[in-house]
Each structure stands twice: as structure tokens, then as C-alpha cells.
């Protein structure tokens, strides 16, 4: 913060207005040579620190953790990498793979994965929107539909979007770009692509240009435009491409580049935590049932009779019932049976997760592990329901949570069972003649549609 202003030879006022520096960053090898020296000078001359925030960058190593060098032949040419994968995918990989202050084990296959799974998903989502928006001539010229009048799915994705804005803004503000990138990546792949767009496809396929279709376009446009702004500090090129393409058609923003716009601001009024929780439960049940289908080799087009879900609270029952139709449609099952007592049906097993217990309880971990494995069905049920459980041992109390244990259950005849946190799902895997015929009919229709 001294030489950059040619201080003390000139710019005294400029220097004083910018001292101490807000932020500096250098490699970890500069701890003594730079970080310490700046503070030492500031302490001697100004009785002050030299900077308010510092990040000590880690080193870029090869994928095996060795320092890159010409002698070892393990160096990666950055220009070849950028030419092959592009600067955005390279930047996104390097920032989201490890924290800036940690060493980065650079693996070229990781960039390829980012390009396919994140960049590809984001651009495919935009391409889906652009395809149907161009067909229908959507330019956002209609009056914007109030959020409270939109479908539950639209309100949910907008709620998640503003929750994301808040979290990303906090992460960047706390100098945690890795956390920000990972949050955005999860939102795009899991919330936007795998859930919102997939469940909304039929709304875009409709022939008529209805109010519901306009709502779908306006919602997806808003999400894509906001995402382009959120990713712009890390992925400057694809963000600008999406932003400019959107605004070329709508002219809603006069900025010529996403980098000349304001960063998104969270609207707390659009955040509905109850709705977010409800949809998260639906996503979790959907994932669990599809996993059970895969485990038992039952394709999704094969209808099944029933899902059985133990519910031990009115709140959980209310949340699942509110999205029951959506769940049944997604997993292709006829009905959900809710049970309030699973003791005669499911026998749970519990075992400790040492990776979680070790840092918390140290030398007591082994004794505590034995107590956990000795828990009865009522204790396991309490832990699943409340999310925590207290074990008393040697006149001491030890609090454990669902993150400290793994709860499993054996499959029961005719059923396949999965547990994830507080949710247990049992899938009826019996395929009757009637269900089999319905599955064949669905398969027949699918084959014909593919041929068309």
C-alpha cells in the first residue's frame, strides 16, 4: 500500500485515504518476505497495521500433490488448457475445487467435468429457454405477473434464488469465492435443471400462449438473468453471453455488459422457508425412490403400487401431503401410505460415524461408539424425529446428531427400504400382472414417440 502510490515522494493525501489497505493477496511463500514486512513498516512509521484483510494463496500442484516443474515433466501449459476447455471452465474449476488459501491439486479431468456438469447444464438450460421463447415470440413485453399469483413451483425457485443471492453475497463479502461457486453450482444443477425445468417442461410445450406459459417464461428468464450476474466474477464470458442474449430480445436492461450491472440484491419478501423445506422433502423422497428403483432394476416407466413412509410429526405429514401428487407423478407410484408406528415393520440399525465423532469427543469416542450401537429402537426413533439424542455415560452427557451416525434397515419381503436423515421410504417392489401390463403400454408408447 506504499509504493503503488509512489509514497512518500508524492500522493500523500491519496495514500492516507487508502491506508491501511482493504485487501492484499500473495502466495504462502510471502508470509515473511511480504506480509510481515508490510506490517513491520506500518508499525514503525504509523503505529498501525498495513492491511485489513489478507489471503495467503496456496500453490498449484499436480494431481498427485507434487510441485509442478519442467524437470519432472508434470507442468500443465495454461494456454493449451484454456484453448481446450475455455477460460471460464478453467477458472470455475480452480476456484471451486479448493479454497484459495489451500494448495490446489490440478487435475485436467476436473475441468472437463466442470465443463460438462456445470457449464453444460447451465447453457443447456438457457438453450431450452431460448428455443421455446423464440418459437412463441416471448420478449418479456407482457406485464410482469405478481410472484404471489404464480405456481408453487415458480414461487419455490424464486425463493431458492433469493436465498442463493443472500448466501453468495455473504460468501463473496467474507472472501470465500469457493463457497459462493459451490452454492451456485448446486442451485443450477439440482434446483434449476434437475427439478424446476424438468417439472416445468410441459408448460413450455403447450400450444396456447396462456398466462401459465407466460409465468413460466418470466420466471425462467429472471432466474437465468440473475444467475448470469452471480457467476460473472468467476465466469466472465459465459455470464456475459447469457446476459446479452437475454437482453437482446427483451431490452429490459440498458447495460451493454453484465459486468456493468449491479450485483443482485436479495428480496427477503420472496423467500418462503416453509415452501423450500417442503420441496426439499419432495426432492429427497424422489431421489430415494429412484435410487431404490435402480437398486431393484425397476425402470421408472414401470408403475408400482405404493410407497410407505413413517411420519412421527404432524408437520412432516402436512409437508409431504402438500406435494404428494408431485412425488407420485415423478416416481410413477400409485399411492403413499403414511404410518405412525414402524416398530412392527422396520427394524432400524445404527452405527457411529467416527469421522464426525472423533473431533467432538476425542478419547471418549470408542466408548461412545459402543453406546450408540447399543441404542434401542425407541432411542433411534427419538434421534430420527428430533434430530438429536443425549447419551449418558460415566456421569457425563454426550449429545449426538444425525450427522454423527448412519441409520439403516434391512429390506422386508416385497419391499426395498432407504433412509436419509429423518426420512425413511419403503418401496413396494411387487409387480402385479396389471402393473406389468401398464408398464408395457408405457414402454410401447415411449418407443413410438422416439421413432417419431
Q: Which residues are covered by each model-predicted region?
A:
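Feature 926 captures the class I aminoacyl-tRNA synthetase adenylation module centered on the KMSKS loop
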Residues: 1-3, 7, 45-83, 87, ...
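Cation-handling catalytic/transport regions enriched in His/Asp/Glu
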Residues: 15
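A short glycine/serine-rich beta->alpha loop
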Residues: 19-30
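Conserved catalytic-core segments centered on acid/base and nucleophilic motifs
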Residues: 26, 34, 230-233
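Acyl activation and transfer enzymes in specialized metabolism, enriched
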Residues: 32-33, 442
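Short Ser/Thr-interspersed hydrophobic loop/turn segments at strand-loop and sheet-helix junctions
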Residues: 37-44
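Structured mid-domain segments that build the active-site/substrate or prosthetic-cofactor binding neighborhood
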Residues: 93-96
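Short, solvent-exposed helix-loop connector elements
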Residues: 102-111
Amino acid at each position: 500500500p506504499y509504493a503503488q502510490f509512489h509514497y512518500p515522494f508524492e500522493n500523500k493525501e491519496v495514500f492516507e485515504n487508502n491506508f491501511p489497505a482493504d485487501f492484499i493477496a500473495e502466495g504462502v511463500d510471502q508470509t515473511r518476505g511480504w506480509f510481515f514486512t508490510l506490517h513491520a513498516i506500518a508499525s514503525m512509521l504509523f503505529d498501525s497495521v498495513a492491511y485489513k484483510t489478507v489471503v495467503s494463496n496456496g500453490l498449484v500442484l499436480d494431481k498427485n500433490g507434487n510441485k509442478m516443474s519442467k524437470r519432472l515433466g508434470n507442468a500443465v501449459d495454461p494456454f493449451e488448457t484454456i484453448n481446450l476447455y475455455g477460460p471460464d471452465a478453467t477458472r470455475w474449476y480452480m476456484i471451486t475445487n479448493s479454497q484459495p488459501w489451500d494448495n490446489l491439486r490440478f487435475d485436467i479431468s476436473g475441468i472437463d467435468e466442470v465443463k460438462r456438469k456445470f457449464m453444460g447444464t447451465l447453457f443447456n438450460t438457457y438453450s431450452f429457454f431460448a428455443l421455446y421463447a423464440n418459437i412463441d415470440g416471448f420478449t418479456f413485453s407482457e406485464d410482469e405477473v405478481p410472484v404471489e399469483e404464480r405456481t408453487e413451483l415458480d414461487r419455490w425457485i424464486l425463493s431458492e434464488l433469493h436465498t442463493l443471492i443472500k448466501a453468495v453475497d455473504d460468501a463473496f463479502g467474507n472472501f470465500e469465492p469457493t463457497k459462493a461457486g459451490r452454492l451456485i453450482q448446486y442451485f443450477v444443477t439440482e434446483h434449476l435443471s434437475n427439478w424446476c425445468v424438468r417439472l416445468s417442461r410441459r408448460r413450455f410445450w403447450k400450444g396456447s400462449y396462456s398466462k401459465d406459459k407466460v409465468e413460466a417464461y418470466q420466471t425462467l428468464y429472471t432466474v437465468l438473468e440473475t444467475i448470469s450476474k452471480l457467476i460473472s466474477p468467476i465466469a466472465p464470458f459465459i455470464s456475459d453471453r447469457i446476459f446479452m442474449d437475454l437482453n437482446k430480445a427483451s431490452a429490459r436492461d440498458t447495460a451493454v455488459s453484465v459486468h456493468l450491472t449491479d450485483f443482485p440484491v436479495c428480496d427477503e419478501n420472496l423467500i418462503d422457508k416453509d415452501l423450500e423445506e417442503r420441496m426439499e422433502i419432495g426432492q429427497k423422497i424422489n431421489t430415494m425412490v429412484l435410487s431404490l428403483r435402480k437398486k431393484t432394476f425397476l425402470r421408472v416407466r414401470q408403475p408400482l403400487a405404493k410407497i410407505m413412509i413413517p411420519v412421527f410429526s404432524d408437520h412432516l405429514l402436512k409437508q409431504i401431503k402438500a406435494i404428494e401428487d408431485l412425488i407420485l407423478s415423478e416416481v410413477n407410484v400409485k399411492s403413499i401410505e403414511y404410518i405412525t408406528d414402524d416398530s412392527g415393520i422396520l427394524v432400524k440399525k445404527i452405527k457411529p460415524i467416527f469421522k464426525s465423532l472423533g473431533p467432538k469427543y476425542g478419547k471418549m469416542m470408542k466408548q461412545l461408539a459402543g453406546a450408540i450401537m447399543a441404542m434401542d429402537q425407541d432411542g433411534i426413533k427419538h434421534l430420527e424425529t428430533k434430530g438429536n439424542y443425549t447419551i449418558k455415560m460415566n456421569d457425563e452427557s454426550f449429545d449426538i446428531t444425525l450427522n454423527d451416525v448412519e441409520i439403516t434397515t434391512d429390506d422386508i419381503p416385497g419391499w426395498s427400504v432407504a433412509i436419509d436423515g429423518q426420512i425413511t421410504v419403503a418401496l413396494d417392489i411387487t409387480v402385479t400382472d396389471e402393473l406389468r401390463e401398464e408398464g408395457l403400454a408405457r414402454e410401447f408408447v415411449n418407443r413410438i414417440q422416439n421413432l417419431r
